[in-house]
Amino acid sequence: MKTFSAKPAEVKRDWYVIDATDKVLGRVASEVARRLRGKHKPEFTPHVDTGDFIIIVNAAKLRVTGTKEQDKKYYRHSGYPGGIYETTFGKMQQRFPGRALEKAVKGMLPKGPLGYAMIKKLKVYAEAEHPHSAQQPKVLEI
């Protein structure tokens, strides 16, 4: 029996919506990364993007455990000497709700062209409304 390998043209992608209200950041991110890769499907193939589209609503109501609200730090650099910026999870959630979730999921996906294609299937919204109702997304409980 030959090993099955999915073809990019044959992949069927579903749309799912996740309500992140009072959900823990890492638990949501790991499940989302798994579904973006397509590892939940029997036809998963490592070198083919077999994942689904994921819509996350209420990303502003995401939470972290313990004291990570103040202790978890995110860094970025301007490219100039001494140009490092540091922010906490709490400040990032206030200014850019959902960016912490996007960064967490992106870190769990493969690096390279395949990972970049996978992260494009993630749609994060701070509030409960999203513009993807035409795709008739199924509700996904985590």
UniProtKB/Swiss-Prot annotation:
UniProt KW keywords: Ribonucleoprotein, Ribosomal protein
Biological processes per GO annotation: negative regulation of translation; translation
Gene Ontology cellular component terms for the protein in this record: cytosolic large ribosomal subunit
One Pfam match: Ribosomal_L13
GO terms for MF: mRNA binding; structural constituent of ribosome
Keyword DNA-binding found: no
Superkingdom, natural source: Bacteria
InterPro entries cross-referenced by the UniProt entry: Ribosomal_uL13, Ribosomal_uL13_bac-type, Ribosomal_uL13_sf
Family per record: Belongs to the universal ribosomal protein uL13 family.
Quaternary state and interactors: Part of the 50S ribosomal subunit.
Purpose of the protein: This protein is one of the early assembly proteins of the 50S ribosomal subunit, although it is not seen to bind rRNA by itself. It is important during the early stages of 50S assembly.
Designated name of the protein: Large ribosomal subunit protein uL13
